[in-house]
């Protein structure tokens, strides 16, 4: 839908604003596996394992994610001092936190056999982003802030849907917190972080070179042009997600 809405973005956002938004979303995608310890991968793997208690998976994955988010929040003054994402740093942190949890719960849904829920969640989030973009950009004319708010609210909509349709938070139990199981999950997930980071570097690092040499506005133009090849990447991700489940099950 981001491809379909490109005319909307280019009309209501300046190239500089769109460049800033693109840098925020790109950096969030890099930070998710680092902040969460790549735990969503472990959630899928252990949730698919019939010999593992899913409640333990939910509980310990949530604790790991919360620790990562809290540590990131503690770094807020330091990040603010560097003027990274000046004036939109708080939105960046909120978007990061919500995406960490939506990703974890979505992977739990897949591992729990709720593939339809996983698929519908993607569609609901996409629809929410589209409608909220139109509301905040066209109706309220809030520009950059409106775009970021729409992304955060779309993540909240996704979280609400996943909370209603999966037993994730119902399965959470403080009694099941286990350091040994958290270590086991992290032992599986942490080695996947370099892979995620390197794929991110291949696909997204060019934006930072453009930012450094040409500025934010040039990155906005690049981000718009990049929507076309992103469609091919999206099609590839469908097969990749199906392969992940088959790999664990077999």
Report each predicted region and the residues it spans:
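Helix-loop junctions and terminal segments of transmembrane helices
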Residues: 35-51, 229-250
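Transmembrane helix-bundle signature of multi-pass secondary active exporters and lipid flippases
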Residues: 25-33, 199, 222-241
């Amino acid at each position: 839908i981001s491809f379909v809405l490109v005319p909307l973005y280019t009309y209501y956002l300046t190239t500089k604003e769109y460049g800033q938004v693109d840098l925020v979303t790109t950096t969030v995608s890099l930070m998710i596996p680092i902040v969460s310890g790549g735990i969503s991968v472990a959630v899928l793997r252990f949730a698919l394992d019939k010999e593992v208690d899913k409640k333990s998976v939910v509980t310990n994955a949530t604790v790991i994610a919360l620790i990562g988010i809290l540590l990131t929040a503690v770094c807020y003054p330091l990040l603010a001092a560097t003027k990274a994402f000046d004036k939109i740093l708080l939105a960046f942190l909120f978007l990061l936190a919500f995406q960490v949890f939506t990703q974890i719960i979505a992977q739990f849904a897949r591992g729990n056999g709720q593939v339809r829920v996983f698929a519908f969640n993607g569609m609901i989030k996409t629809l929410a982003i589209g409608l909220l973009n139109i509301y905040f950009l066209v109706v309220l004319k809030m520009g950059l802030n409106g775009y970021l708010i729409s992304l955060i609210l779309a993540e909240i909509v996704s979280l609400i849907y996943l909370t209603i349709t999966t037993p994730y938070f119902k399965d959470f139990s403080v009694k099941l917190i286990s350091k040994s199981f958290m270590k086991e999950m992290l032992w599986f997930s942490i080695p996947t972080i370099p892979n995620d980071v390197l794929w991110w570097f291949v696909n997204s690092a060019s934006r930072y070179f453009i930012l450094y040499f040409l500025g934010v506005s040039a990155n906005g133009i690049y981000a718009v042009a990049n929507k076309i090849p992103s469609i091919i990447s999206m099609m590839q991700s469908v097969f990749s997600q199906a392969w992940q489940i088959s790999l664990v099950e077999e």
